Regions:
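Short secondary-structure transition/capping segments
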Residues: 130-132, 182-183, 232-234, 398-400, ...
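Acyl-donor binding region in acyl/amide transferases
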Residues: 79-176, 338-340, 344-412
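Secondary-structure transition/hinge residues
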Residues: 34, 93, 110, 114, ...
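A conserved beta-strand-loop-helix scaffold within acyl/acetyltransferase catalytic domains
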Residues: 17-79, 125-127, 165-178, 183-362
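C-terminal catalytic domain of photolyase/cryptochrome flavoproteins
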Residues: 3-8, 57, 391-431
Length: 431
C-alpha cells in the first residue's frame, strides 16, 4: 500500500465520539491547547452557573483520544433560549472532518436544550497585525514582536471550514463587542527581568513607569473584603467612558469561582512615601543652590554659574510646590487608591480584563504601574503571553473614542490579533 493509499485509508476509518467531560478534564485540555483561554475553563463556567447559565463540558474523541473540547452554555428559557460557546470550541478548524463533527454535535446539544440558535466566537486569530494594525507576513511578524510560529493569516480556510457546517459568519467589524474580536498582546519571551521589560516599552511609557515609581505608587493585590473599593474605582472610568460597570456581586463571583486565577490589583499612592520623596528632592535642590551661590563668589565664568543657579532655583520652587501638594494628599489618607485592574491567569496567558482609575491622580500613572507590575509577575512565573484584551480595531482615526485606550496599550509595544469573530447557526425554525 502506498503512502497516499494509507493516508486515504486512515481518513476513511476515522471514528469520532462525543461525551460529557469533567471540569478538571476541560481545564487540562484548555491548558495545553493552542487556543486555550480562561473563557474555556471551569472558573468562568462556575461564574456563569452562578448567574443562571446552564453549563456543560463536552469532549470530542477520535479513536479514544481527546482531540477537541468546549464549554457549552445554554442561556434563557422558552422561546428566548439560545446556546453559546465563548472563545471556542477548542478544535483544529483546518481539519474539516473534525470541525463538521464538532458542530453537528453542538447543534444537536443546542436543539435538545430547546435553543433557537447557536452562537460561537472561536479563539482563533484570523489575522496577526503589528501594533499599528497593519497586516503582517512571516518576515514582518518577527520584526513586530510576534512569537515564532504564530500564523499571520488571513485564515480564510478556517472560516470556510466553519461556514461549511451551516454557520453564518458575521464578517469583520470594528468596534467593541461582548467578546472582543480585536486583541492587543505582548510577547514577553526573552525578557529576563524588570530592566529588560522596561527597556521594551515606548519612550513615554518608560517615563510613566518611572514617574509612578518615583512618586510613591505601590501596587497591591487586594482581598475579597476590598472588592467594593475595586468596583468604585472601575465606576469612575465607566462614567467617563459611557460603559456600564459590573456590580460588586459579579466581582465577588469571579473571586470565589476562580480563586488564585483571579488577581484583583489596586495601585495606591503612599502619601508618606510621596512626601518623603519630594522633601528629599527639595533639600537636595536647596543644597545645590547653596553650593552654587558660594561658587559664584570666585567663579571665573559667573554667567555659567548664574544659568545653573536659575535652573536649580526653578526646580527647587517646583519641589516646594510638590511638597505642599503632598501635605494635602496626606489629609486624604495614608494610601490613596488611584487605579485598579483585574487579571485572569490561564496556563497559556495572563489576561487584563477589567480596570478603572481616578482621573484626579492621573499624573501618577498608577494604571501604567499596575501593567508593569503584572508583566513582571508574568516573567517570574514563566508566562510569556500577556493579553491586554480588547481594543476596537480602529487604528487610523485619532479622534476615535477608543484612541486613548489603544495608545495606552500600544505604549507597551505589543502586537494585534484579529480574531475570526461571531458565527451563528439556526437550530430551530423561527416561529
Amino acid at each position: 500500500m502506498t503512502n497516499i493509499e494509507a493516508s486515504a485509508a486512515k481518513r476513511a476509518t476515522r471514528t469520532f465520539t462525543c461525551s460529557d467531560i469533567t471540569p478538571d478534564e476541560m481545564d487540562a485540555f484548555s491548558a495545553t491547547h493552542p487556543q486555550g483561554n480562561f473563557q474555556q475553563a471551569s472558573g468562568m463556567g462556575r461564574v456563569r452557573q452562578a448567574n443562571g447559565v446552564a453549563v456543560s463540558y463536552l469532549g470530542f474523541y477520535e479513536n479514544g483520544e481527546l482531540v477537541a473540547a468546549t464549554q457549552f452554555e445554554v442561556h434563557g428559557h422558552g422561546l428566548g433560549t439560545f446556546a453559546e460557546v465563548h472563545d471556542g470550541p477548542l478544535a483544529d478548524f483546518h481539519d474539516r472532518e473534525l470541525t463538521s463533527y464538532v458542530f453537528s454535535q453542538l447543534r444537536a446539544r443546542a436543539k435538545a436544550a430547546g435553543a433557537a440558535q447557536l452562537v460561537v466566537t472561536p479563539e482563533k486569530p484570523y489575522r496577526t497585525r503589528n501594533s499599528a494594525g497593519e497586516p503582517l507576513d512571516a518576515e514582518g511578524a518577527s520584526l513586530a514582536g510576534v512569537p515564532a510560529g504564530v500564523e499571520t493569516g488571513p485564515d480564510d480556510e478556517g472560516i470556510a471550514s466553519i461556514t461549511s457546517c451551516g454557520l453564518a459568519h458575521e464578517g469583520f467589524p470594528v468596534g467593541y463587542q461582548a467578546v472582543p474580536r480585536w486583541r492587543y498582546l505582548k510577547d514577553l519571551t526573552g525578557l529576563a527581568d524588570d530592566k529588560a521589560l522596561l527597556a521594551s516599552y515606548s519612550k513615554n511609557t518608560k517615563r510613566n513607569v518611572r514617574i509612578a515609581h518615583d512618586n510613591g505608587v505601590v501596587v497591591r493585590r487586594i482581598g475579597r473584603d476590598e472588592l467594593g473599593l475595586f468596583h468604585d474605582i472601575c465606576e469612575l472610568s465607566c462614567e467617563k467612558q459611557g460603559f456600564e460597570n459590573k456590580p460588586v456581586s459579579y466581582f465577588e463571583q469571579i473571586y470565589d469561582a476562580m480563586g488564585d486565577a483571579a488577581e484583583f490589583n489596586v495601585a495606591f499612592i503612599d502619601t508618606a512615601e510621596h512626601l518623603a520623596i519630594w522633601e528629599k528632592k527639595r533639600d537636595a535642590f536647596a543644597a545645590d543652590i547653596a553650593k552654587l551661590e558660594k561658587s559664584l563668589e570666585t567663579a571665573r565664568t559667573p554667567e555659567k554659574v548664574e544659568r545653573k543657579l536659575a535652573d536649580v532655583r526653578k526646580k527647587h520652587e517646583a519641589a516646594l510646590r510638590r511638597v505642599e501638594t503632598a501635605h494635602k494628599y496626606e489629609t486624604v489618607g495614608a494610601h490613596i487608591p488611584a487605579a485598579a485592574a483585574l487579571f485572569i491567569w490561564h496556563p497559556r496567558e495572563c489576561v487584563y480584563l477589567f480596570s478603572g482609575s481616578d482621573a484626579t491622580y492621573a499624573k501618577f500613572y498608577a494604571a501604567t504601574a499596575i501593567q508593569h507590575h503584572v508583566m513582571g509577575e508574568c516573567i517570574e512565573r514563566g508566562c510569556m503571553r500577556y493579553n491586554f484584551y480588547g481594543i476596537n480595531g480602529v487604528f487610523d482615526n485619532p479622534n476615535d473614542p477608543g484612541r486613548g485606550l489603544l495608545e495606552f496599550k500600544q505604549g507597551f509595544e505589543g502586537y494585534v490579533e484579529e480574531l475570526m469573530g461571531y458565527f451563528e447557526m439556526p437550530v430551530r425554525p423561527a416561529v
